[in-house]
């Protein structure tokens, strides 16, 4: 953002939302002009106030990442169908890869989360979801592959004891979105800046969602692909999601 300010004269006042919902409200209440979300949260912002897709970050030629469900190697669980009667930890209900896509995979496997899972733990984050598994509090856990691989590298997860149970299809990298009410000339200037900033600065300064190093930003990522990914969540309706959250509240 500092580089874009210096080169293109577009100034930013960066603020961290207290929650996924707060980040959406900030854009839709016109307290923010640009937001950076997961795909699901972007979908909410688009539905509520017509947030426009600005860009997704690209790493090693890929503009997607993956969600996963994990379990211990001695759990006896070898397929998603075998989660029936087991316990599952997930992240925040608005999280694309630690809640929404994992439950979409569970539903696709014929499992009704609220009825068929013994217990659901809403851990609140990828890290906490993984911790619930490694500490033996649940049979399986959901988190992004990035979070899982980071936990393995840090020694939090012992790969000799835990395994990937299921991996999602590619999920669009967390998109940058713009308030639709911005002036057209400013929108064009912002798009140009994000599309070519990687050619103007040292590559180590190009950062993606969460601060990871990326190659560039793709400002021409098709909206149809973003919406297509969100369509895969169609079975996870508001009713089903409500039942899951209610189940998680049971003691």
Pin down the residues of each PLM region.
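Short, polar/charged alpha-helical segment
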Residues: 1-11
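Surface-exposed patches in mature extracellular/periplasmic domains of secreted proteins
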Residues: 12-17, 120, 203-206
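Beta->alpha turn/N-cap motifs
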Residues: 16-20, 30-49, 57, 142-152
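Pocket-lining segment of extracytoplasmic ligand-binding domains
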Residues: 75, 84-185
């Amino acid at each position: 953002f500092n580089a874009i300010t210096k080169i293109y004269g577009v100034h930013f006042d960066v603020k961290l939302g207290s929650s996924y919902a707060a980040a959406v409200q900030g854009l839709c209440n016109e307290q923010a002009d640009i937001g950076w979300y997961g795909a699901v949260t972007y979908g909410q912002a688009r539905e509520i106030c017509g947030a426009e897709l600005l860009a997704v970050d690209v790493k090693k030629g890929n503009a997607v990442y993956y969600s996963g469900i994990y379990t211990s190697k001695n759990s006896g669980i070898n397929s998603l169908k075998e989660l029936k009667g087991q316990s599952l930890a997930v992240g925040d209900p608005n999280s694309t890869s630690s809640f929404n896509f994992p439950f979409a995979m569970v539903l696709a496997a014929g499992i009704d989360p609220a009825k068929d899972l013994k217990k659901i733990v809403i851990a609140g984050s990828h890290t906490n979801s993984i911790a619930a598994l490694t500490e033996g509090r649940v049979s399986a856990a959901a988190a992004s592959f990035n979070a899982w691989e980071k936990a393995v590298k840090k020694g939090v997860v012992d790969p000799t004891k835990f395994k990937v149970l299921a991996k999602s299809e590619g999920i669009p990298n967390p998109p940058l979105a713009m308030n639709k009410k911005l002036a057209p000339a400013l929108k064009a200037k912002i798009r140009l800046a994000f599309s070519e900033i990687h050619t103007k600065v040292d590559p180590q300064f190009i950062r993606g969602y969460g601060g990871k190093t990326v190659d560039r930003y793709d400002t021409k990522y098709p909206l149809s692909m973003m919406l297509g990914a969100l369509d895969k969540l169609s079975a996870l309706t508001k009713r089903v999601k409500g039942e899951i959250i209610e189940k998680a509240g049971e003691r």
